[in-house]
């Protein structure tokens, strides 16, 4: 029997690591809950725990949004916002807000049966492995955070909208789309992470509003343990992937997604 603290620690650890590794956090939270015999956290709890990942993104990439400048004449701090990057993130976030918001408003239980099933998650894992393989084998381009077009941001944002389907992996599909569009490895991962900040926040806010009563059933201190674990494991995942991916590509994660898919199928 898992204690509440251990259960939320496990939720946070899995969420933090798999949110940024291209392997799907939603799929792992669901499958791990079955493996350990604990409750599926469901979309509401998953969304609120994801806020730990958002905080990790803010901390890790704070210098990509703000440049600190000390004005000697006025002796005040003036934060210069990287406007182009913020515009790109805004443009790339539009598709997932439109699609996710539409589904939540008009068909709120769209994913509960078919798309959250283990069979569906396994099949999506195989499809993502194929996409990631094609992207990893594509010719490496020179598009980066400084010279990209807003149309690049929108295209990657369109792919991010697919991440509302359980098992897709937001980072996996956006990194793959960036690589196929001619982005370099390092900046494709970096932009994917930055683009995830408003998307993850939006999901958490929508779930909080639509399932407000459900949050009263969560114990406060175990939830804090989950959020803290998510934050710390997210920082580790971001740092590791940026270092590893720039030199090694997606090979390790492609193999993992195939194995993960077969493990799910064998346990149906």
Curated annotation (Swiss-Prot):
List the coiled-coil residues: none
Q: What class of enzyme is it?
A: hydrolase
UniProt keyword Lipoprotein, yes or no: no
What compartments host this protein?
Cell inner membrane
- According to its UniProt record, which reaction does this protein catalyse? di-trans,octa-cis-undecaprenyl diphosphate + H2O = di-trans,octa-cis-undecaprenyl phosphate + phosphate + H(+)
The protein's UniProt keywords, in alphabetical order, are: Antibiotic resistance, Cell inner membrane, Cell membrane, Cell shape, Cell wall biogenesis/degradation, Hydrolase, Membrane, Peptidoglycan synthesis, Transmembrane, Transmembrane helix
The source's superkingdom equals Bacteria
| UniProt-recorded name of the protein | Undecaprenyl-diphosphatase
The primary gene name is uppP
